């Protein structure tokens, strides 16, 4: 597969769920996002898309309660691990159902079933089924999920971390991270000073403030730093963080009409 034909697209957890209400999906938002994607793919049949989505209010509450991200060892930890897995899977099932209704040929690839990490770094992950899904002109879907870890028992991998690993093998030309915020802001939460471009080599600690939402995988700063690292290791890949809260926003981004923050 040629890189120019592949886009990684993330639907942020804060976009597709109400992160202030436990396990509450925004079905109306999902529907117009998936409608935008369907229109784009119908108009651009040569393009391949890999989707990732966050867990939002489905995974982050349980993950924060048990601190699953930091490791799993006790019986209570493992019960928490399973609870996070259940919540993440529940949202993924909703996503797959809505995508199928939108006539998008999606297939889910839960990281917990195929990825083993060691010290929160990918040790093994058989991505051949994902590659073959793309070659068959189907749409693979990954999502933030628990994984077993050889050093710390278990942990959580965010969608951005999954994208980072997949990019080394699939080489997307573009990565779109759709969320609520219109850009990365240097004055959060006032949100008056958007950053239109962030260099892959630029330090983030001086201009990115903490997220307003509970996010066990690190929030905006972690997201930006992960994507900067991805850009450094995959020259030519362009990343955009943007808002898709309104119908048509995603379609514009897919068509290259930039409105958010570009990382390159």
Feature locations, PLM:
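Acidic, metal-binding active-site segment of PIN/NYN-like and related structure-specific nucleases
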Residues: 169-194, 241, 246-247
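Catalytic-site beta-strand/loop segments enriched in glycine and acidic/polar residues
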Residues: 129-161, 202-211
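Glycine-rich beta-strand-to-loop/alpha-helix junction loops that act as flexible
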Residues: 11-14, 52-56, 242-245
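Charged helix-capping and loop-helix junction motifs
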Residues: 25-28, 123-128, 155-163, 221
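N-terminal glycine-/serine-/threonine-rich phosphate-binding loop
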Residues: 1-50
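Short beta-strand segments
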Residues: 8-12, 50-53, 109-110, 141-143, ...
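Ligand-binding beta-strand-loop-alpha-helix segment within the catalytic cores
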Residues: 65-146
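Polyanion-binding loop/helix "lid" in catalytic or ligand-binding cores
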Residues: 79, 83-96, 153, 161, ...
């Amino acid at each position: 597969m040629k890189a120019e034909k592949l886009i990684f697209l993330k639907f942020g957890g804060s976009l597709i769920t109400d992160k202030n209400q436990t396990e509450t999906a925004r079905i109306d938002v999902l529907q117009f996002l998936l409608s935008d994607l369907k229109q784009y793919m119908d108009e651009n049949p040569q393009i391949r898309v890999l989707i990732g989505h966050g867990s939002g209010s489905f995974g982050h509450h349980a993950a924060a309660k048990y601190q699953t991200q930091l490791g799993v060892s006790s019986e209570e930890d493992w019960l928490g691990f399973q609870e996070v897995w259940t919540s993440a899977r529940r949202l993924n099932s909703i996503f797959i159902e809505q995508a199928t209704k939108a006539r998008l040929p999606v297939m889910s690839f839960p990281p917990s079933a195929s990825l083993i990490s060691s010290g929160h770094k990918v040790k093994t992950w058989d991505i051949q089924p994902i590659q073959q899904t793309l070659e068959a002109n189907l749409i693979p879907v990954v999502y933030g999920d628990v994984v077993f870890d050889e050093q710390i028992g278990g942990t959580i991998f965010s969608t951005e971390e999954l994208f980072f690993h997949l990019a080394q093998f699939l080489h997307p030309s573009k990565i779109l991270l759709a969320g609520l915020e219109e850009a990365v802001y240097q004055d959060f939460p006032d949100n008056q000073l958007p950053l239109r471009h962030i260099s892959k080599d630029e330090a983030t600690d001086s201009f990115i403030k903490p997220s307003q939402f509970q996010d066990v995988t690190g929030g905006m700063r972690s997201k930006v730093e992960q994507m900067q690292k991805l850009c450094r290791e995959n020259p030519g890949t362009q990343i955009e963080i943007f808002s898709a809260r309104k119908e048509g926003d995603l379609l514009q981004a897919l068509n290259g009409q930039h409105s958010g923050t570009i990382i390159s």
